Amino acid sequence: INLRDAVNGTISYSNEAGKIYQLKPNPAVLICRVRGLHLPEKHVTWRGEAIPGSLFDFALYFFHNYQALLAKGSGPYFYLPKTQSWQEAAWWSEVFSYAEDRFNLPRGTIKATLLIETLPAVFQMDEILHALRDHIVGLNCGRWDYIFSYIKTLKNYPDRVLPDRQAVTMDKPFLNAYSRLLIKTCHKRGAFAMGGMAAFIPSKDEERNNQVLNKVKADKSLEANNGHDGTWIAHPGLADTAMAVFNDILGSRKNQLEVMREQDAPITDDQLLEPCAGDSTEERMS
């Protein structure tokens, strides 16, 4: 319902103090993030089993909003999270193509950006782009879940233990290799390479807020200098900071598709799997 209201421009909220929140003119392009394929929708069953929550999310959003979106020059756009393999991407391509054919829409009307946030998927980016070639916009560095996937996948290997969370930053070799490989793979195929989430929240305390903004600037500078075409933020209060960094580096360019990372040595499996150095403390485990 909220997504429908956002598409129609009627979404609003009034808090207990009477303050009203509503959309400004020309809002950002709306992209629907469906649930991961592993999560069921228990309220809808098929042959006695719950259907995938992601399919439920896609069907509801697409069916109720595609006409309004197309009428205003936009379209049904999606983020696909938690992908493990190219076979998942191929399945989504079949779903999208079926929906387009069912409603007499041109191929490619439905577009998607896929998050590379699992350790298996980082080794299959070429295959994923190919599988979704009729619908793909780009790939995104879903780095926090990628770090979790690294920990979960390699949990039985003592030599792959990561240090405390604050030490696992995107400038560390294994994460920087992940970022550069995503850029190189996407741009080779003409797809956009989106940077990861800045998971910081602005603070009302000026000193604390300056620390947050400086961290965001450093993080986004690394992404933009690597060759990412855009990025994610967790709070609209960080939009101006992130945008200023990308505008400074991109200048008049709308993207960095020409950045092919040709100067890089081949990125190896060992680089993607090598943990970074740092302290592992009992305090951070609690």
Predicted regions and their residues:
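Conserved alpha/beta-domain cores
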Residues: 1-286
